[in-house]
Amino acid sequence: MSSTALAVKGVEISFETTTLAFDCAVPAKRIVAVAGASGSGKSTLFNIIAGFEQPGRGEVRILGEEMTGRAPAERPVSIIFQEHNLFAHLDVATNVGFGISPALRLDAANRTKVEDALARVGLAGFGKRLPPTLSGGERQRVALARAFVRHRPILLLDEPFAALDPGMRAEMRALISDLHEEEGNTILMITHHPDDVRALADSVLFLDRGRIVAHDEVDRFLGRRDIAAINRFLGNEG
């Protein structure tokens, strides 16, 4: 297995008025915060990695394998969005079961895996509940359970805590840290909060105007004063 989990090389994608360009390499088994102002290209980078958008040039390699031409379902990637992760009309266990089999062909062993996954995220006994009856934090825990039953080596978290209060954010950060330690996967997490960087990340990819302008270990990133956009993110201005 490659020691580099993710390599984005010479990737460019053009929209009507702008071209975004990305280059980065992420070591395996790390938690990487992906930060930057709204519109800096964070979600576009995730969409390219996951296969939802195709770049005009460049390549994406995951664990050394080139991803060009692979559909999202064929990539070793799970993604959790800020919201809309679950099917509201299906119970929690069924939502998690989709992570094992999209056709929901689950034998007894797989149903046990679903129950175990829910227990791991603190939702034992929630299998028959419907998503609309859950809190925002509980719904994100269900999405995490589904991601982890897939056992994909790359997990993309697109602002997973955005709708949560500070206490729930801290609980979710701790849960993700614990699950990451168990799984040994590589996590990229979009965030607008320096506290998420300090509490959870090993390193930071920082984007500004469609470019990755910094890729630093956390301590170095938190000490930077040379890039205005980073100063704004960290609240160092004024």
UniProtKB/Swiss-Prot annotation:
GO cellular component terms, A-Z: plasma membrane
Chain sites annotated for binding ATP: G36, A37, S38, G39, S40, G41, K42, S43
Keywords, alphabetical: ATP-binding, Cell inner membrane, Cell membrane, Membrane, Nucleotide-binding, Translocase, Transport
rRNA-binding is among the record's keywords: no
Domain called ABC transporter: residue spans: 1-234
EC number: 7.6.2.15
Any one Gene Ontology molecular-function term assigned to this protein's record: ATP hydrolysis activity
Keyword Glycoprotein: no
Reactions this protein catalyses: thiamine(out) + ATP + H2O = thiamine(in) + ADP + phosphate + H(+)
Any matching Pfam family: ABC_tran
InterPro entries the UniProt entry points to: AAA+_ATPase, ABC_SmlMolc_Importer, ABC_transporter-like_ATP-bd, ABC_transporter-like_CS, P-loop_NTPase, Thiamine_ABC_ThiQ
Topological relation to the membrane, as annotated: Peripheral membrane protein
Compartment(s) where it occurs, according to its Swiss-Prot or TrEMBL record: Cell inner membrane
PANTHER family (UniProt xref): SPERMIDINE/PUTRESCINE IMPORT ATP-BINDING PROTEIN POTA (PTHR42781), THIAMINE IMPORT ATP-BINDING PROTEIN THIQ (PTHR42781:SF1)
Quaternary organization: The complex is composed of two ATP-binding proteins (ThiQ), two transmembrane proteins (ThiP) and a solute-binding protein (ThiB).
Function noted in UniProt: Part of the ABC transporter complex ThiBPQ involved in thiamine import. Responsible for energy coupling to the transport system.
Family designation: Belongs to the ABC transporter superfamily. Thiamine importer (TC 3.A.1.19.1) family.
UniProt-recorded name of the protein: Thiamine import ATP-binding protein ThiQ
Organism per entry: Rhizobium meliloti (strain 1021)
Organism taxonomic ancestry: Bacteria, Pseudomonadati, Pseudomonadota, Alphaproteobacteria, Hyphomicrobiales
